[in-house]
Regions:
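Short, structured coil segments at secondary-structure junctions
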Residues: 56-59, 66-67, 159-161, 220-221, ...
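Short, hinge-like loop/turn segments at secondary-structure boundaries
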Residues: 57-60, 80-86, 125-131, 182-184, ...
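Active-site phosphate-binding/coordination module
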Residues: 21-121
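Conserved acidic, metal-coordinating active-site core of Asp-based
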Residues: 100-208, 212-217
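Short active-site oxyanion
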Residues: 36-40, 59-61, 138, 203-204, ...
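A short acidic, helix-capping loop that chelates divalent metal ions and anchors anionic groups
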Residues: 14, 80-81, 173-177
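Mg2+-dependent phosphoryl-transfer enzymes with acidic/Ser/Thr/Gly-rich catalytic loops
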Residues: 1-3, 22, 181-262
């Protein structure tokens, strides 16, 4: 069997509703990692939050964080996770986005670098935050209601054509927000950087997801698998749908059958 790159979204996919990677999943991924398959986490989270949520992600060789803006490799050394790819936003871009802040419409603008997240709510000078950051990877803009999110999606896309601006939605509710990244940044881009490093063809990439920011990787990777609990529009774009949810080890149950069949 050819070596596979297995790309895993976290929230709603690998993590259960308690935000935990099950012991069954950890044990299974350790087993297939030893067989030579490349386990890669692909998430919208920053590195720090990814490691907290997965208790160190020992089962993974790579982490694609910030919706594809950065890639880290498990070096099995004291420094552990080494950055091998980054596509960052300029501070000028962040200032321009922040200039639209309106307390009557916005809740917060979350500004992320590789390892931290800072919240801007209009009460301080944006430069006080930017001075603390070196490599800005990702903005998350949260609104008081979904109508404002739709309003600013159209506005920002017209004003900032050089940015990747997407409407996101909670898989377990209807809350919407905007993710803003450098043009061309998406989970699939980060995954392809891992594939290049490992010499793996696209047909040997298996991606799992449940949310709107997983659609492109499910469409573009060789095999796209939507979770049973995924949003309907995500399922429509997938090659397969797991028979079990994220609370029932859906990823593992799928791989146990799929990797045997091929």
């Amino acid at each position: 069997m050819d070596k596979k790159l297995i790309a895993l979204d976290l929230d709603g996919t690998l993590l259960n509703s308690d935000g935990i990677v099950s012991e069954i999943s950890k044990s299974y991924f350790k087993k297939i990692k030893e067989q030579g398959h490349i386990i890669t986490i692909a998430t919208g989270r920053i590195l720090k939050d990814t490691l907290i949520g997965t208790e160190g992600a020992e089962f993974a060789k790579y982490i694609v964080s910030d919706t594809g803006a950065a890639v880290f490799r498990n070096e099995d050394t004291e420094t552990k996770w080494k950055e091998v790819y980054i596509n960052q936003l300029s501070k000028e871009t962040v200032q321009n986005i922040a200039s639209y802040y309106d307390k009557n419409k916005f809740t917060t603008i979350e500004i992320r670098d590789r390892n931290s997240a800072h919240h801007y709510d209009g009460t301080i000078n944006i430069m006080e935050i930017l001075e603390k950051l070196s490599e800005i990877t990702h903005l998350t803009v949260v609104f008081l209601n979904n109508e404002f999110a739709k309003e600013y999606l159209d506005l920002f896309k017209s004003k900032f054509p050089n940015l990747e601006i997407e409407m996101m939605q909670d898989s377990f509710g209807d809350k919407k927000w905007l993710d803003i990244l450098q043009k061309g940044v998406e989970k699939y881009k980060g995954i392809t950087e891992v594939a290049k490093l490992e010499g793996i063809s696209n047909e040997n990439i298996i991606a799992f997801g449940d949310g709107l920011n997983d659609i492109e990787m499910l469409k573009k990777c060789g095999v796209g698998v939507a979770m049973k609990n995924a949003l309907p529009e995500v399922k429509e774009q997938a090659d397969y749908i797991t028979s079990e949810t994220n609370n029932q080890n859906g990823v593992v149950e799928f791989l146990k059958e799929y990797l045997v069949e091929i």
